[in-house]
Amino acid sequence: MITLLNLLLAEIAGFITYQHFTASPLRYFIPYPAELLLFAIPLVGLAVRRPFSFYYYSVLIFFNISPILARSETFEGIIDTLNAIDALYNTGTSAIAESLKVAFIGHSTSVDGLLAVTWLYILAEVFQGNWESIKGAKTGGVEIERAYLVYLPAFFFALLVYFLYPFLMSEIDFGLERIVAAVLGIAAFFAGVYLLSRGVEEEDINSGG
């Protein structure tokens, strides 16, 4: 079940990334079949039961890099290096540098895609961690009542990260609805911890009896 859930999250993240990639200047520099990897990698990940791995998340970040690339020092370094190579060896790389500048600088895109796939990855990791904890407890002979309710606070915890991330990373307006969502997320998280601890506690009491 957890593998299929993470596969679904991975494919959603892949679709979001595909939409942002095809609207970005990065598509001019990457040949066509490459973006199909966004949908193929999670399917390959099924073989190791981790369709939404960190490696796949890294691929998603690469395809979502356009909004932040032009404003980075790395991008400026690439442009300067290409110009320097052309000046020294007359390789014509300054034309490539100019093409990159025209394509990326001034291109208006948002980081919504980057934020969305990051949240989906965190959500997948939180679900995976909860599933492994439940599985480990059951392997040790501990039956946890209402174990799957733990996934609900896990979802709200990941949602809390989603709402807090833009507030921490930028100076956008932090509306009341986000504060309410954050409070609910924190409450749900601690409720999940409480349910889990109570289940383990009750099992220990029953085992001791």
Swiss-Prot record:
Positions of transmembrane segments: 26-48, 147-169, 179-196
Protein localization: Cell membrane
Membrane topology: Multi-pass membrane protein
Cellular component annotations (GO), alphabetically ordered: plasma membrane
Keywords attached to this entry: Cell membrane, Membrane, Transmembrane, Transmembrane helix
Domain of life: Archaea
Protein's name according to its UniProt entry: Uncharacterized protein AF_2423
Species per Swiss-Prot/TrEMBL record: Archaeoglobus fulgidus (strain ATCC 49558 / DSM 4304 / JCM 9628 / NBRC 100126 / VC-16)
